[in-house]
Amino acid sequence: MSGTLVLVRHGQSDWNLKNLFTGWKDPDLTALGVEEAKTGGKALADYGIKYDIAFTSVLTRAQHTLKIILDEVGQPGLETIKDQALNERDYGDLSGLNKDDARAKWGEEQVHIWRRSYDVPPPGGESLRDTGARVWPYYLTEILPRVLAGQKVLVAAHGNSLRSLVMVLDRLTKEQILALNLATGVPMVYKLNADSTVASKEVLGDMSGAH
């Protein structure tokens, strides 16, 4: 068995609260989001991992979540790599719009297709497949080799960028990944085999409230 990979979605952001499409826009965490990150950090502290390196996106909500978690686990100075490859899915023309307003403009069925299909992007944006096309190569070149070398790696990112990873790690079909939501601030701990397959997965919290 090789190293450990921990994935955690950022805590609730201001735009999550306001029901806006966020994508690459850059709101910070709400007070609840801060508490979610602290809860996730405490769960990881109790789990007892000491990390070798962390990865996050270039967006504030993921970086803030990571900072809170690192404080909770007692590693505030941990080496951190920030890359837009881990950014949230780009919602294009939907970014910044209220989801109800978008439904009024384009119709509920069309917005549902953009949100929940695997390979149909919104205007000017990315589909989940597009998101995976940048996340997965980055994982293979930058993150996986460290895990296979025995390192313990923490990744704080976004719902769709992490779903792109979970889809491959958990060997989910397109239909299964579209039905999967990741709760904010809830860590997932993967232990990998030497051939990069998953030896075990633990969820440190409640995924039932995911949205």
UniProtKB/Swiss-Prot annotation:
The protein's enzyme class: isomerase
Question: Which species is the source of this protein?
Answer: Rhizobium rhizogenes (strain K84 / ATCC BAA-868)
Designated gene of the protein: gpmA
Which biological processes are named by the entry's GO terms? gluconeogenesis; glycolytic process
Catalytic activity of the protein: (2R)-2-phosphoglycerate = (2R)-3-phosphoglycerate
Taxonomic lineage is:
Bacteria, Pseudomonadati, Pseudomonadota, Alphaproteobacteria, Hyphomicrobiales
Q: In which pathway does it act?
A: Carbohydrate degradation; glycolysis; pyruvate from D-glyceraldehyde 3-phosphate: step 3/5
- Domain of life where this protein originates: Bacteria
Q: What is this protein called?
A: 2,3-bisphosphoglycerate-dependent phosphoglycerate mutase
NCBIfam families from the UniProt entry? pgm_1 (TIGR01258), PRK01295.1 (NF002339)
